[in-house]
């Protein structure tokens, strides 16, 4: 089977509510939906970045241009089943641009799996689990609203793990916020925080022990992405797990973090790491180094989330579960099939490919008019 055509379209999907981070506030998510065609079959992938280029070096506009102008011409007419060959071709054609490459690889894997009548997880060796515990992000910026949200999620048996966004208030106000959540939720919930690089090492060294005393189990990216030595010292000096997110994007960065034992947990993100194959390799580095893997998100839609679930279902150990909440914070969906949360766990889609069918009407509705 040869690749006949590759298409990329930008869609802008609003969120149900603003998502407040230390670096930006997200009101909508922009995705690039990539379709790869071969002999009447189509595979679908997705690229994107949280809040645009403020989080990473890519945005929807660059992803679309890279896919259409710089990747597609090199892939047309090549073997649609040879995903490894396509990855090498893309690496030679374009430096960086991880999300653009990830979107194409997702589409190729979806196409291949559908042609063979299997899931992407089966292409990757087979799933080890059918569901993954999922954390909900508390990011309204308001303590009462966050607490009400957490209580509702627990009562509905959707979430009992909560990641709280910190860093857009003062550290002292963050601590007061966490004290209120911890005291109110008690043993009914597992709490973790994401600082999104907002602290320096001195501030982190003061407030991480305070958070640990409140029962926080995981601290995500407390300092700047380049300051990996600070991450190492914070990991050495605290019992609570420290997780790399922004500091981790390539196989080389994974090796450096593992060699220096800078963190306890790797946050896996397909679009940030360049796709399924690259993320698999980073998960293998974590496993070999005794570092835990975590199923991260780029606020992906049902398409990207389903591909992530296919991969995460094959990772040997995910002690902290995942946070694939993208489809549940969006005001609408891009697929006909919904994703299901049951008893605090996100169910891995069944069926062929990534398990989702693109809703073409929704794509047309949210497609950006250039």
From Swiss-Prot:
Pathway: Aromatic compound metabolism; 3-chlorocatechol degradation. Coiled coil: none annotated. Pfam families: MR_MLE_C (PF13378), MR_MLE_N (PF02746). GO terms for biological process: amino acid catabolic process. Keywords: Aromatic hydrocarbons catabolism, Isomerase, Manganese, Metal-binding, Plasmid. The keyword Manganese applies. Mn(2+) binds at residues 194, 220, 245. It catalyses: 2-[(2R)-2-chloro-2,5-dihydro-5-oxofuryl]acetate = 3-chloro-cis,cis-muconate + H(+). InterPro entries: Chloromuconate_cycloisomerase, Enolase-like_C_sf, Enolase-like_N, Enolase_C-like, Mandel_Rmase/mucon_lact_enz_CS, Mandelate_racemase_C, Mandelate_racemase_N_dom. It is an enzyme of class 5 (isomerase). It comes from the Bacteria. Its cofactor is Mn(2+). One of its GO terms (molecular function) is manganese ion binding. SUPFAM superfamilies: Enolase C-terminal domain-like (SSF51604), Enolase N-terminal domain-like (SSF54826). Its EC number is 5.5.1.7. Belongs to the mandelate racemase/muconate lactonizing enzyme family. Chloromuconate cycloisomerase II is highly active toward chlorinated substrates but retains diminished activity toward the non-chlorinated substrates. This is Chloromuconate cycloisomerase. It comes from Cupriavidus pinatubonensis (strain JMP 134 / LMG 1197). The lineage of its organism: Bacteria, Pseudomonadati, Pseudomonadota, Betaproteobacteria, Burkholderiales.
């Amino acid at each position: 089977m040869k690749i006949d055509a590759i298409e990329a379209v930008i869609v802008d999907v609003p969120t149900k509510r603003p998502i407040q981070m230390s670096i930006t506030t997200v009101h909508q998510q922009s995705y690039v939906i990539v379709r790869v065609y071969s002999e009447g079959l189509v595979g679908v992938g997705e690229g994107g970045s949280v809040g645009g280029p403020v989080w990473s070096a890519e945005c929807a506009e660059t992803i679309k241009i890279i896919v259409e102008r710089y990747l597609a011409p090199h892939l047309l007419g090549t073997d649609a089943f040879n995903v490894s060959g396509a990855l090498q071709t893309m690496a030679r054609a374009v430096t960086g641009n991880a999300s653009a490459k990830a979107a194409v690889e997702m589409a190729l894997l979806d196409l291949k799996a559908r042609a063979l009548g299997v899931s992407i997880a089966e292409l990757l060796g087979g799933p080890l689990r059918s569901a993954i515990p999922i954390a909900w992000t508390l990011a309204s910026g308001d303590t009462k609203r966050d607490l009400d949200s957490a209580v509702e999620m627990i009562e509905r048996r959707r979430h009992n793990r909560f990641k709280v966004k910190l860093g857009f208030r003062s550290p002292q106000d963050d601590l007061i916020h966490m004290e209120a959540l911890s005291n109110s939720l008690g043993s009914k919930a597992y709490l973790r925080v994401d600082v999104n690089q907002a602290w320096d090492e001195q501030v982190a060294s003061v407030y991480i022990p305070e958070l640990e005393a409140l029962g926080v189990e995981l601290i995500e990216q407390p300092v700047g992405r380049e300051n990996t030595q600070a991450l190492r010292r914070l990991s050495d000096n605290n019992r609570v797990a420290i997780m790399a997110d922004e500091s981790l994007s390539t196989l080389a960065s994974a090796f450096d973090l593992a060699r220096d034992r800078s963190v306890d947990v790797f946050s896996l993100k397909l679009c940030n790491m360049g796709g399924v194959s690259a993320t698999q390799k980073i998960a293998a580095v974590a496993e070999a180094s005794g570092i835990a893997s975590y199923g991260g998100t780029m606020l992906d839609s049902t398409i990207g989330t389903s591909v992530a679930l296919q991969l995460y279902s094959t990772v040997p150990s995910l002690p902290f579960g995942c946070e694939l909440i993208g489809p549940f914070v969006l005001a609408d969906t891009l697929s006909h099939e919904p994703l299901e949360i049951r008893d605090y766990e996100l169910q891995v889609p069944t069926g062929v490919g990534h398990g989702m069918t693109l809703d073409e009407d929704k794509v047309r509705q949210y497609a950006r008019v250039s």
